[in-house]
């Protein structure tokens, strides 16, 4: 009769016996499931405990690392031993605040090519709008630079009024007449003073424009500059020896115009350059008398308003 393996090995046999006794005992009392459940709970407790410990260790290490980094950072900070150290820190702060600004690259527009013929109306409009290719096309096709509209205004007049200095130079080089007068007998210099471009004014004077040219009202370019309030134009004309005492059709000098229009900066400028304040206009008034006349007129207006309000207040009482 063959023996089983367990029976031949005494230790194994005893183990099996104990296990069978334990299982039998537990099963016998109906507590096997409870024992297994307790065993699992103990295992879970062990596992949870080990995870918590690992997490705590991790947090401790992170705190230590942060502490070391902070300590290192503090050690690397510049020390304030003197004023030079303070200035160094301020300079470093300023550098940090400076931000790089990316400037967008703008492509230059390609030159406009004009194929069709340019008529007179388009030519005048191009002078106003500073469309150089249109002007060049018109001139290249043999167009007359001195052509004018029904008011005898030329392209040069228009370009001067808008301050298109490059176009003015182009038109003059093409043969435009600087002294050409429109219906009101204004020259290019008059139109420039209306527009207020000092650069265009300088160009015209350098090209030989008459500085004291007269229009239909006998006004000079200086009269126009004072009336329109273009200080720099007036100053440049005076510096180029424009006539300070030129009289228009009403006998007014630029100073008379400045007083009448309350151009205080112009008045100071003219006085600075030695204008004669005793010149009388056609009405027999000096600039100073115009000031007094204006003041008296203002007083009369205010006095009239005061008396009117006084009467109204008394009437309202009854």
UniProtKB/Swiss-Prot annotation:
The keyword ATP-binding does not apply. Keywords: ANK repeat, Coiled coil, Nucleus, Repeat. ANK repeats lie at residues 118-147, 151-180, 184-213, 217-246, 250-279, 283-314. Residues 37-77 form a coiled coil. It holds the Pfam family Ank. It comes from the Eukaryota. It is found in: Nucleus. GO terms for cellular component: cytoplasm; nucleus. InterPro entries: Ankyrin_rpt, Ankyrin_rpt-contain_sf. May act as a nuclear transcription factor that negatively regulates the expression of cardiac genes. PANTHER family: ANKYRIN REPEAT DOMAIN-CONTAINING PROTEIN 1, ANKYRIN REPEAT, PH AND SEC7 DOMAIN CONTAINING PROTEIN SECG-RELATED. This is Ankyrin repeat domain-containing protein 1.
